[in-house]
Amino acid sequence: MTLLPGDNSDYDYSALSCASDTSFHPAFFPQRQAIKGVFYRRAQRLGPQDDLHQSISLGDRRRQIIINVGGIKYSLPWTTLDEFPLTRLGQLKACTNFDDILSVCDDYDVTCNEFFFDRNPGAFGTILTFLRAGKLRLLREMCALSFQEELLYWGIAEDHLDGCCKRRYLQKIEEFAEMMEREDEEEALDSEDQESEGPSTSEGRLSRCMRRLRDMVEKPHSGLPGKVFACLSVLFVTVTAVNLSVSTLPSLREEEEQGQCSQMCHNVFIVESVCVGWFSLEFLLRFIQAPSKFAFLRSPLTLIDLVAILPYYVTLLVDGAASSRRKPSTGNSYLDKVGLVLRVLRALRILYVMRLARHSLGLQTLGLTARRCTREFGLLLLFLCVAIALFAPLLYVIENEMADSPEFTSIPACYWWAVITMTTVGYGDMVPRSTPGQVVALSSILSGILLMAFPVTSIFHTFSRSYLELKQEQERVLIRRAQYLIKTKSQLSGMSQDSDILFGSASSDTRDNN
């Protein structure tokens, strides 16, 4: 293959000029199966039978450009690139010498006017389709990040992606950005940990204490303290849930209404106080070790902790205020209001169960899926609302005109029946009596099954993908933690060996002097 020698070549670059012949329709060269081992290689490694330029005359070479990408050759007219002057292929028209050409492509064959690009041929097929037809699609079998690199290389903006592919492409990019952000935070924490292993200063001791506190509170797999702390947290959550259930027994409720407190009621209060004390201590430790206090207070799990912990202290304040302001002349109205507030606040204690999301990969996956599938949940709610608004009035009219059913007293009451029926729950409290009403009920059941199946499929795939991502991330964290511990042990062993050598030589010198 003959290549241009450089800027001093007498080669006629007029062959690179673009002739504006609108009646010219070049032959389209379809893609062929790439030979095994040619992927990401230069074209000159292909056999002679793959030379497409042999069938192109010299006049056609002035109007056509031959592109060789990863061993697969394409031919397209120069006029195709007029609409895309800012792309990498469009920049070839502005090249005036060999060095300009090599700044755009990887290699150039003068004899056949062929440009070589050492890029992914599969992705270039999509790029070429965009240049020829104006349609840019995301390949399902190709990584979104690799496709982004190809778009940047060929100089094509992401805005040209079709709507069906753009959302999936942006979602993949956002997921990767979140993963990289988490990895950067972990690397920053690891670097802080390595810095804290330095000289034994007051700042170094404080950094080591904060690192150990962070490992114990946020990383259950970091060691024995983290596992013990996580087990205690789960244990107190379980005890709180059981204690809340016991506090609703009829005997305890009667004592509460009468203003009495037996030994069992006192024990329930003590258990609740101990659990809230543990949760308060845990919240305080998490707040102390958080690098960014504002970001910590904004996190969803922190807000859940506050909503679950604060009702206990508010209840104590309200009880104290109610006992101090209690007067015989006011009657029971004030006490009834205070009792209602206390019952509502105590019901919020069930939010302690959400704290298990800190230690459960399944609950974390559920929250991530809910955040990613807001559009699917909106579609599901929209489908149900439309179907409910259709079947409820229809059944109301049928049952009141034909069967005079006592259950379907109004359209809002029929809304409840439609919700229960379309979600296939079927309590049986409202049953259509007439034959047309039963036909409507059957239609609503089938509609509910079909309408719920469409978004649920997408939600299921998102849940599976999110679970796999979180599991892989957890494995990466464990591997990084193990590597950090191995590195720390090797450094400590090296320091101990150096100290042994130093003190050993010093002691030998002392003996020699003696």
From Swiss-Prot:
Segments of skewed composition (Acidic residues): 181-196
Topology, Cytoplasmic side: 1-224, 290-300, 360-374, 468-514
InterPro entries (alphabetical): BTB/POZ_dom, Ion_trans_dom, K_chnl_volt-dep_Kv, K_chnl_volt-dep_Kv6, SKP1/BTB/POZ_sf, T1-type_BTB, VG_K_chnl, Volt_channel_dom_sf
Major place of residence: membrane
Swiss-Prot/TrEMBL keywords: Cell membrane, Ion channel, Ion transport, Membrane, Potassium, Potassium channel, Potassium transport, Transmembrane, Transmembrane helix, Transport, Voltage-gated channel
One GO-annotated biological process of the protein: action potential
Positions of region (Disordered): 181-205
Any one GO molecular-function label of the UniProt entry: potassium channel regulator activity
Membrane disposition: Multi-pass membrane protein
Keyword Transferase: no
Side Extracellular, residues: 247-267, 322-338, 397-411, 432-438
SUPFAM superfamilies: POZ domain (SSF54695), Voltage-gated potassium channels (SSF81324)
Coiled-coil residue windows: none
Regions that enter the bilayer but do not cross it: 412-423, 424-431
Protein localization: Cell membrane
Subunit structure: Heterotetramer with KCNB1 or KCNB2.
Function: Regulatory alpha-subunit of the voltage-gated potassium (Kv) channel which, when coassembled with KCNB1 or KCNB2, can modulate their expression and their gating kinetics by acting on deactivation upon repolarization and inactivation during maintained depolarization. Potassium channel subunit that does not form functional channels by itself.
Family assignment from sequence similarity: Belongs to the potassium channel family. G (TC 1.A.1.2) subfamily. Kv6.1/KCNG1 sub-subfamily.
Protein name, entry field: Voltage-gated potassium channel regulatory subunit KCNG1
